[in-house]
Amino acid sequence: MGSVVDAPTVVAGQEEVTDNMLGDKKVTVVFVLGGPGSGKGTQCANIVEHFGFIHLSAGDLLRAEIKSGSENGTMIENMIKEGKIVPSEVTIKLLQEAMIKSGNDKFLIDGFPRNEENRAAFENVTKITPAFVLFFDCSEEEMERRLLGRNQGRVDDNIETIRKRFKVFVESSLPVIEYYNAKDKVKKIDAAKPIPEVFEDVKAIFAPYAPNAA
């Protein structure tokens, strides 16, 4: 099975991406990556509102599948309970199904791929390469400050687990960012700035995808 990794590189921000078909529809996929507390969720909501993208969170899709009580959901729940990593193919299948069901052709995929294996599997299985990767760059100190300061009732927002999550991000997700950076497909955002300023930077990147930017 051929990989799209060697497909001709295209300039990020252009609609012309190689082999990006979902059924009979050409699609635009943007991977959204950043450490815990980097502000990805807030900005994804802004992008959805202003640019007509569908926001897909791999974690949310897995949780929804577990909640559905399906056979697949039970299998996912058992794997998580046993501390095993859910196979990439399972997550990718959920992402594909959500993309098809949405009827849209522009997608933000948030928090995935988490590692190189995820990335390679996504490209091999879907034959879709991202138009670009939106990377929310933020120091560990700032992310820690934000996570400890917000009150979302998340049990995993204590200092030790925050540091563990950050370490996992650096070890697993940064190689994905480096891979796409070598292909000139990373749009880096200074996520330490105030939310409105961050969105100004985001808007400049997404301008070609505005509904009236034909």
Curated annotation (Swiss-Prot):
Protein residues bound to ATP: 37-42, 150, 193
EC numbers: 2.7.4.14
Catalytic reaction list: UMP + ATP = UDP + ADP; CMP + ATP = CDP + ADP; dCMP + ATP = dCDP + ADP
Keyword annotations of the record: ATP-binding, Cytoplasm, Kinase, Nucleotide-binding, Nucleus, Pyrimidine biosynthesis, Transferase
Cofactors (names): Mg(2+)
Annotated segments matching region LID: 149-157
Note describing how the cofactor binds: Binds 1 Mg(2+) ion per monomer.
A GO molecular-function descriptor: dCMP kinase activity
Name of a matching Pfam family: ADK
Region (NMP): 57-86
Gene3D superfamilies xrefs: P-loop containing nucleotide triphosphate hydrolases
Subcellular location: Cytoplasm; Nucleus
Top enzyme category: transferase
Positions that bind CMP: 118
Family indicated by similarity: Belongs to the adenylate kinase family. UMP-CMP kinase subfamily.
Quaternary assembly: Monomer.
Cross-referenced HAMAP family: Adenylate_kinase_Adk (MF_00235), Adenylate_kinase_UMP_CMP_kin (MF_03172)
PANTHER family: NUCLEOTIDE KINASE
UniProt remark on domains: Consists of three domains, a large central CORE domain and two small peripheral domains, NMPbind and LID, which undergo movements during catalysis. The LID domain closes over the site of phosphoryl transfer upon ATP binding. Assembling and dissambling the active center during each catalytic cycle provides an effective means to prevent ATP hydrolysis.
Described purpose of this protein according to its UniProt entry: Catalyzes the phosphorylation of pyrimidine nucleoside monophosphates at the expense of ATP. Plays an important role in de novo pyrimidine nucleotide biosynthesis. Has preference for UMP and CMP as phosphate acceptors.
Name this polypeptide is given: UMP-CMP kinase 4
